[in-house]
Amino acid sequence: MKKKALALLCAAALTLGLTACGNPGGQSSNAGSPSGTNTVGSSAHTSGQNTDFPTKNINLIIPYSAGGDSDNMFRCLESSMSQFLNGNVIVGEIVSGGNAIPGTQQALDAEADGYSIVIAYPGNICIQPNMGNATYQYSDFQAIANITASPVLFAVQESAPYDDFTGWVEWVKAHPGEFTFCTGSLGGTPHLAMMKMLYALGIQDDVVYVPYSGNSEAYAAVAGGQIGGYAAVASGVVNKEFVKPIANLGTVECPAYPDLETLTDVGVDMSQATDVFCGFACSSNVDKETVNALSDAFAKAMELPEVQENFKNLNYTTNYLNAEDFQAYLDENYEAYAQVIQNLDLTQ
């Protein structure tokens, strides 16, 4: 009964015509490229820099668990940054828990001088402020640089009677109410990505959603046969036993599964796709020259072959955006998530 109530909540609230959360329109050709390649180029470097910055180490708040995507992304860059920061380093500090709100707030509480920055992820920057859970506002932040983009993948039980996205859609339509899916959190990026897809296909009433508390629990439920499928960022699906990915719900190619069907293959416009960005942000009160100096340092590090190799080895797709382009990308994502969250009645 609880499962059906959750499904009806989603069905009653969400409407079609959702704005893209993936590749933003109206940007330069380097911004938000869905090609799956590193987009560092001439537009990556910014002008008006503070050339004296930094004069000491920079503290990076990672508001998610150690070993997670945001932590791993930073580790790919960590050892290469000092050569572009006047010999100083970025020190990562894990402050996890509370839907990433406490750690994100900690970065804001520090002096707005550019020496305290935070991982910028859809959850802490766009989703939590829209849901009304955060102790801060979206406008409290400004973008520094984006580093990676990852699609949301949809996987099902390995023994399922369909092997691709098209087959799954046909099966769901023929068996309304029988398919269950889960994600690691209610209102998280994978959940919202699935709901956009379901409504675009008109099958939102034919499936039942079950929220879990964490990606590992969601995966275990599907691998163990209790739930039909789950949606997660690519790293939560790649190389997992007893499940099979059948769809890429984003615009960015997943290197581990380059031939996965996308929304286009089932007749849905890619404006309904959802990609997961991971970058850096800081207080909106930090001066632009300092922000540009940080953005340029990340751009230079991203050009290094060893850094690119680090990301490749972890199946991350690099997608550098400078401060200006990343800000535009964040703005579009914030508005898109606002609409989805409002339609799902997930605001607190």
Question: What role is predicted for each listed range?
Answer:
Residues 1-5, 9-10:
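Positively charged n-region of N-terminal signal peptides that target proteins for export
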Residues 17-20:
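C-terminal motif of bacterial Sec signal peptides marking the signal peptidase cleavage site
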Residues 69-73, 77, 99-103, 123, ...:
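Stable alpha-helical elements in mature extracytoplasmic
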Residues 81, 106-115, 130-217, 263, ...:
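Hinge/capping helix and adjacent helix->loop/strand transition within the periplasmic-binding protein
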Residues 121-122, 158, 233-235, 250, ...:
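Short secondary-structure boundary segments
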Residues 139-147, 208-210, 236, 241-273:
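Short beta-strand->loop
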